[in-house]
Amino acid sequence: MANFLLPRGTSSFRRFTRESLAAIEKRMAEKQARGSATSQESREGLPEEEAPRPQLDLQASKKLPDLYGNPPRELIGEPLEDLDPFYSTQKTFIVLNKGKTIFRFSATNALYVLSPFHPVRRAAVKILVHSLFSMLIMCTILTNCVFMAQHDPPPWTKYVEYTFTAIYTFESLVKILARGFCLHAFTFLRDPWNWLDFSVIVMAYTTEFVDLGNVSALRTFRVLRALKTISVISGLKTIVGALIQSVKKLADVMVLTVFCLSVFALIGLQLFMGNLRHKCVRNFTELNGTNGSVEADGIVWNSLDVYLNDPANYLLKNGTTDVLLCGNSSDAGTCPEGYRCLKAGENPDHGYTSFDSFAWAFLALFRLMTQDCWERLYQQTLRSAGKIYMIFFMLVIFLGSFYLVNLILAVVAMAYEEQNQATIAETEEKEKRFQEAMEMLKKEHEALTIRGVDTVSRSSLEMSPLAPVTNHERRSKRRKRLSSGTEDGGDDRLPKSDSEDGPRALNQLSLTHGLSRTSMRPRSSRGSIFTFRRRDQGSEADFADDENSTAGESESHRTSLLVPWPLRRPSTQGQPGFGTSAPGHVLNGKRNSTVDCNGVVSLLGAGDAEATSPGSHLLRPIVLDRPPDTTTPSEEPGGPQMLTPQAPCADGFEEPGARQRALSAVSVLTSALEELEESHRKCPPCWNRFAQHYLIWECCPLWMSIKQKVKFVVMDPFADLTITMCIVLNTLFMALEHYNMTAEFEEMLQVGNLVFTGIFTAEMTFKIIALDPYYYFQQGWNIFDSIIVILSLMELGLSRMGNLSVLRSFRLLRVFKLAKSWPTLNTLIKIIGNSVGALGNLTLVLAIIVFIFAVVGMQLFGKNYSELRHRISDSGLLPRWHMMDFFHAFLIIFRILCGEWIETMWDCMEVSGQSLCLLVFLLVMVIGNLVVLNLFLALLLSSFSADNLTAPDEDGEMNNLQLALARIQRGLRFVKRTTWDFCCGLLRRRPKKPAALATHSQLPSCIAAPRSPPPPEVEKAPPARKETRFEEDKRPGQGTPGDTEPVCVPIAVAESDTDDQEEDEENSLGTEEEESSKQESQVVSGGHEPPQEPRAWSQVSETTSSEAEASTSQADWQQEREAEPRAPGCGETPEDSYSEGSTADMTNTADLLEQIPDLGEDVKDPEDCFTEGCVRRCPCCMVDTTQAPGKVWWRLRKTCYRIVEHSWFETFIIFMILLSSGALAFEDIYLEERKTIKVLLEYADKMFTYVFVLEMLLKWVAYGFKKYFTNAWCWLDFLIVDVSLVSLVANTLGFAEMGPIKSLRTLRALRPLRALSRFEGMRVVVNALVGAIPSIMNVLLVCLIFWLIFSIMGVNLFAGKFGRCINQTEGDLPLNYTIVNNKSECESFNVTGELYWTKVKVNFDNVGAGYLALLQVATFKGWMDIMYAAVDSRGYEEQPQWEDNLYMYIYFVVFIIFGSFFTLNLFIGVIIDNFNQQKKKLGGQDIFMTEEQKKYYNAMKKLGSKKPQKPIPRPLNKYQGFIFDIVTKQAFDVTIMFLICLNMVTMMVETDDQSPEKVNILAKINLLFVAIFTGECIVKMAALRHYYFTNSWNIFDFVVVILSIVGTVLSDIIQKYFFSPTLFRVIRLARIGRILRLIRGAKGIRTLLFALMMSLPALFNIGLLLFLVMFIYSIFGMANFAYVKWEAGIDDMFNFQTFANSMLCLFQITTSAGWDGLLSPILNTGPPYCDPNLPNSNGSRGNCGSPAVGILFFTTYIIISFLIVVNMYIAIILENFSVATEESTEPLSEDDFDMFYEIWEKFDPEATQFIEYLALSDFADALSEPLRIAKPNQISLINMDLPMVSGDRIHCMDILFAFTKRVLGESGEMDALKIQMEEKFMAANPSKISYEPITTTLRRKHEEVSATVIQRAFRRHLLQRSVKHASFLFRQQAGSSGLSDEDAPEREGLIAYMMNENFSRRSGPLSSSSISSTSFPPSYDSVTRATSDNLPVRASDYSRSEDLADFPPSPDRDRESIV
């Protein structure tokens, strides 16, 4: 660390000299020598050190971190030694420019010639790093872009081009000279961005000097120069990096998308090939003769082909230029009389929409997936093929469009998230380094303190970076001495060579501006100086105080740099050090701080100069975040605080020399932080002084008193309330403007505007007086207000000069002032602000992409649009969408980004050829729309959190508006209470009721029928939020706490933006909590509390735990708890619906029952009929159930209760609901013609009504009114039954034809809603939706506010300008403005009645109409007509002219970006967020599990669901066995998959117009494949026998094979009546899913499919809900729009005449497609658009629509289906995708366990679940990664300590568990999980053989080793004895005297016997070598055999002979051991 503590200043930077280069070379040589040694070590298996990495904040092109200080001026632009230690062994040097940007260069020779010290290269480096150089290049590029955007450049621009080329050449030359060309790192071509420069220059010269024909195509490449901006601006590089990363991540999704689209395209090809060419052709007659000519309408054609290809003979669709398609199937479109359906001409849309070949089918499917103009394709296909094929489109839309497109979003979002995490990790890394540095400083500081050294006095001088060098030198010497001192224990000493690397002074620290980065994610970090705080949640607890901080937070500052060390009074001790802080010292500066304009906070009460300890001076002031807006100068609401140290105290420092010691590093850090603070300053000090002098007005006492009074008024909450009301009124006034206003109305609006302008000006003036300008302009809102006021005043001044409606638009910004008091709007604006901030670079990238493609389009296609315009435009004018000039090219690209690409692409393909257009358009679509826009959306979602949406204000206090409202409420409450008391006083003289009666009348509500205890959720409910209130005042006559009172639980009130602000000043939070806890304790202890106000009663206690009296026995009560009765007919109990947590626990039911023993009757009893209030007010409601009439009534109720609760009753009601809903579907336009059905339906309707009324009455009697009417689902039932009842009564009385009754009848369409509560799946979804409704409504409201601004602006711009004069005879085409100029001329010319003035149906004539227009623009449906009208508009009621107002397009572009893109996507954000919140509420273990635990839990979950399978036994027959071996090989499967894919390819080759030869060949190929697959099937059946049918895949194959054979045989019949039999072959593609498991590389795709599988159940529920919504709306549509005129989107097939047709229309607009076309005819109100008197089949008249009903119908449907339900679908996919990705990144996946069991089958063919210990090693080696343990693996397996059962067998669970543990690592949770798993496994496999381990692998090894040790020891012992005995015998034989047999060591026993034998046999003289090595020691076996009686070794202990064989006796070895 000593290295770290080098001083700052010049010594950090050393010039790069030849010596430096030599030093680097020396280090490189050393490293190489070390490297060879290291590689040797690694071969020996020693751990390698972690390789060093380049430091992130010292990377090239980053700014030098502040800690390194400022380089001296003379070193700027000069080569310096590299600061990053990573490059210490590489030939590099760095250069810094004035902006301290790092440039890194290679120190090798550039171009072999120029060394780093060559003057030419130095000059080039100086130029390159200079900021002016990059500015010059930037300006050149921008100028070049301007020139490129000219569509018809003048001739002189050629010379400008040469200039540009010269500048780019010069740039590249400088770079090459400075960096070198390409050989080494950091040279020119090593940077990919330079490749771009290089290619641009090469292209420029190539086009100039070589003639290459089509120059415009090559000129197009020049547009790539725009990309150079990215290489110049470093911020863009990172975003592009993120884009490239996300594109890489998209690979899997792209593969899956292409695969799915290919499958769907194949299906489309087979189903619809050639269908779209069927047209309605005029009838003709064939003329007799040989030439085949035909005649029609008296005209003769040469041949039938010529006739069929003549467009004049086709019938056109009504009101369009499209040909009417038709089909030959029964439900396809039909032709009118005089026409027949024939295959003729080309396909629709210039021939580009078709399924005639695979390529066109694929394009059609891609278009379907991106949902561009898909309704057109849908209508064309259904008209030509039949309505049944709606199913195909549903599949493609739901699987393709919703799933795949959103997967792309999910992947891009995840890539962004990962990058974000990486940024956070990088900052954490820096922080860690910083912490290490701080530890070091602390140690040094403590060391100095112990020595008694003054550690502070340095700071004054040496905090300055200009401290003299001599000081630095002296300090570094001193530090060297210090760091080798005893206190540090030598731990921090570094090798000498390190301290010599001077330039790398602060390497270990490398702290950047990361300090103040606010974009980080919040996270808790102890001792962190990096504040990870969400931008929008200011926290007051930066320095903890008791009031608003937790212990954890204050603790987190313990080691923080920014908190002063505890203060100490100097009087106690002169010696500086750490001690206790001064008593009562305030650390949190909330109450006593001021903020200056720089955001620096001074603590006013932070102690005086004497009270400051040395510690507090280590740091100068630093602010990490700017303080938020302050309301008053003296008050600083929650925000980051900061302490300003006082002047240093010099007392107590005796040693003069101490002033020059230590803390150099502290000065480094301090000055770095000081610089950081300076960088945050908003204004320089001189401005600061000026502002404080002139902008704070405190002149005289009179002024001050006026100021105080004004302040009192202005700052009062009521002033805010008044201003807010004025804003709302002003907005209302602006919204009242409309077309055709009367003069009086207009004048009123103008006066209103003047008044409001006056009010807002006055507000601003008074606020400036009250606050002084200095403080007024420190608040963002005030600045905003002042700007708007100034603009309003400007507008007043300028309005006389002309119509400046643009300035009027600025008034609209006042609406945003609402955000101040409306948190949701505020949050939303912040979200958009944050996103736009974060999106700055991304927006720039998008702009560059749009620019590039616009220029490319203009260069490539521009000319073609003008030359070949006749192909796409009948009028001869240029079409609206063309690429002739840059603006129009930009519009086309923007339109593609909006998702509309296909129509403009058709035009392009017509004029410019197919290939190039396809390439450009699809590139823009994929890059721009799918990637960049999804990245936008990902950023938007990431800055979104609904916690903020519902949170109150940031500082946790109420804002002024809420205070004002609370005051008003308090006033009203006071008035109410006073009035109440007064009335009670008057009534008090009445005699009281007897107490007994009062008590009795109160009993029934809660206690009269004792209930079973509440469910666990209620019992364990968390304490309610602080919104819960208890009324303090008691109402008279409510009894006392001693009375028998009901236990009632208040429900937590729902949150809203302006909540009931009852926590007023008089009722503080503390007392409130005391009160509630007191009441809670009363309840729990069995006491009773007074009843609350009715609205606070809990439905929980009344319903959930009700359903009658519980029995006295505790056991029964327990049973009741487990199976609680519920009212299924009414759906969910309110406990689910309303209450999240109740405040009080229920009293113990057993105690209650003891109190009232006589009521413990049957549990299945109903509740009371009436609420307690009713009983109290009407005692007659109280029935005595013990007497005769009451008893009968009670029995009746019990009977009804049993009926209603019976499951059969519920089933019957569901059946009736479905029947009645189904009956509604028959009430269509043809009902009058079908008399029988009509009569049947009438009777059925009556029957249903009676049944439902009966059900309702039964439920009333059974449940009582109280329970029935406190349940939302029951209310729904009640209302729907009422509608049926009223319509039935009206029918009976003959009022059926009355208008109101008719409209009431349409409400019967709501009947299916009753099914909601009965179907669990739908109810779950609805509950989730209901939970999200508050947030959704919030966002909807905010969207409406946003849109209001655009709508008012639209009214200002376009009101009255959308009209035009039309000539009816010319087919509704507007006349030229030269003929008719305006509305009055049109009316005056209208003599014949053929001219009339009309308006575009959707216009901006008022704000309401504007909203509808904006909805069409935002959903991109019908927006073209609106835009065209706006662009063509000239003036008020003037005839439009083609593109007269061209730049009005910009209004729509801006609206689409802010109004559509941001606001509509917020819906996804809100819904996802709500899902997550609800998950948190419901989520159990997920939230309480650590990441580690989750990992184990998931692995175990997968593991437990598997068990070993018995493999299919191999046949005994030799041939069958051979086939079996082939069939079961993986290669066989892969081969079959390959053949399937090949089969698909042959299917792709088919086209509609193929030749007979091709048809023949393909048929034969098909037969071949059918034969192959049939063969496969037969072979498998032969090999696998009856086991073949045990596998579902095999059954699937079998069915497909049978179908293929049938299809081939009966192809003609099937094709004629059904569809092409080749479709069966497509089904076979499903088998590809099977092979994905085998391919390791397909893991990503498996994850995606897994995400889909996980989503399916939820998606099914959402689909059901969507179907229900569609059903209801289609019934409404049939009732209201059946007879609407056919035009636009409504025709003979797509209409509301029948249920089926309505469903077709509604499915189409579920994705919002074509809803404008369906709405258009409904907006017709009278002639000439429709005929109000046309008679209809049901007796009504007219084919006009009803605009109000139509608009309501379509807008609500779009909001419900498109914005909510479809977004729920998206939310689920995103959620499951992240879950699936998590699963796939887990170390062990499902596949790994599958693989384990597959291998297991081979080792355990009988599925005994055990394998032999001997086989374990092979088994472990046979597995695949990550479970595999490769051989040699004996030791690893032994260490696993696996339990073994008798017979040396090991259980599969034990093995799997051990292997899993090895992969996941050790963890404390493993044991608990193991027990769980074993229990689970036992339960799943009851047949398991008794499992009692007798030993383990480790114990077995221990035993073996022990045995070996014992053997060896015994052998050695024997050997020693033998040697002794041999020695004795030898000596004896040699004739030593005195040796008798008695002296022998071994007189008897085996050794003596054998030795004596040996020696006695010898005849010759004994030599030393004659002792046979085999003769002794005796073998172990013989010893044990002979002496088994007397030796304590049992052979049975070593059960296996191998153990002994392992260790053969080796005398040599033993001899050595003795020696």
Curated annotation (Swiss-Prot):
Q: Where are the IV repeats?
A: 1512-1809
GO BP annotations of the record are: calcium ion homeostasis; cardiac muscle cell action potential involved in contraction; cardiac ventricle development; cell communication involved in cardiac conduction; cellular response to calcium ion; establishment of localization in cell; muscle cell cellular homeostasis; regulation of cardiac muscle cell contraction
For this chain, the Swiss-Prot or TrEMBL PTM comment says:
Phosphorylation at Ser-1505 by PKC in a highly conserved cytoplasmic loop slows inactivation of the sodium channel and reduces peak sodium currents. Regulated through phosphorylation by CaMK2D. Ubiquitinated by NEDD4L; which promotes its endocytosis. Does not seem to be ubiquitinated by NEDD4 or WWP2.
State what inhibits or activates this protein: Channel inactivation is regulated by intracellular calcium levels. It is a tetrodotoxin-resistant voltage-gated Na(+) channel (Nav).
Q: Which Pfam families match?
A: Ion_trans, IQ_SCN5A_C, Na_trans_assoc, Na_trans_cytopl
Intrachain disulfide bonds: 280-335, 908-917
Q: Where is the composition biased (Low complexity)?
A: 1098-1115, 1963-1982
The III repeat units are at: 1189-1503
CDD domains membership: Na_channel_gate
Q: Which residues lie within the region annotated Interaction with NEDD4, NEDD4L and WWP2?
A: 1977-1980
Q: Where is this region: Interaction with FGF13?
A: 1841-1903
Region of interest: Disordered: 27-66, 461-575, 610-647, 1000-1144, 1963-2019
Omega-N-methylarginine modification sites? 526
- Quote the InterPro entries the UniProt record gives: Ion_trans_dom (IPR005821), Na_channel_a5su (IPR008053), Na_channel_asu (IPR001696), Na_chnl_inactivation_gate (IPR044564), Na_trans_assoc_dom (IPR010526), Na_trans_cytopl (IPR024583), VGCC_Ca_Na (IPR043203), Volt_channel_dom_sf (IPR027359)
**Which keywords describe this protein according to UniProt?**
Calmodulin-binding, Cell junction, Cell membrane, Cytoplasm, Disulfide bond, Glycoprotein, Ion channel, Ion transport, Membrane, Methylation, Phosphoprotein, Repeat, Sodium, Sodium channel, Sodium transport, Transmembrane, Transmembrane helix, Transport, Ubl conjugation, Voltage-gated channel
Q: Which residues are in the IQ domain?
A: 1903-1932
Where do the II repeats start and stop?
699-971
**Intramembrane feature ranges:** 358-378, 887-905, 1403-1424, 1700-1716
Catalytic reaction annotation: Na(+)(in) = Na(+)(out)
Question: Biased-composition ranges for Polar residues?
Answer: 507-528
Q: Does the keyword ATP-binding apply?
A: no
Q: Which residues lie on this side of the membrane: Extracellular?
A: 150-157, 210-216, 273-357, 379-386, 738-746, 797-806, 861-886, 906-914, 1228-1238, 1294-1299, 1358-1402, 1425-1447, 1550-1560, 1615-1621, 1682-1699, 1717-1747
Q: Which GO terms describe its cellular component?
A: cell surface; intercalated disc; lateral plasma membrane; membrane; perinuclear region of cytoplasm; plasma membrane; sodium channel complex; T-tubule
Q: What does this protein do?
A: Pore-forming subunit of Nav1.5, a voltage-gated sodium (Nav) channel that directly mediates the depolarizing phase of action potentials in excitable membranes. Navs, also called VGSCs (voltage-gated sodium channels) or VDSCs (voltage-dependent sodium channels), operate by switching between closed and open conformations depending on the voltage difference across the membrane. In the open conformation they allow Na(+) ions to selectively pass through the pore, along their electrochemical gradient.
Give the similarity note.
Answer: Belongs to the sodium channel (TC 1.A.1.10) family. Nav1.5/SCN5A subfamily.
> What name does this protein carry?
Sodium channel protein type 5 subunit alpha
Query: What organism does this protein naturally occur in?
Result: Mus musculus (Mouse)
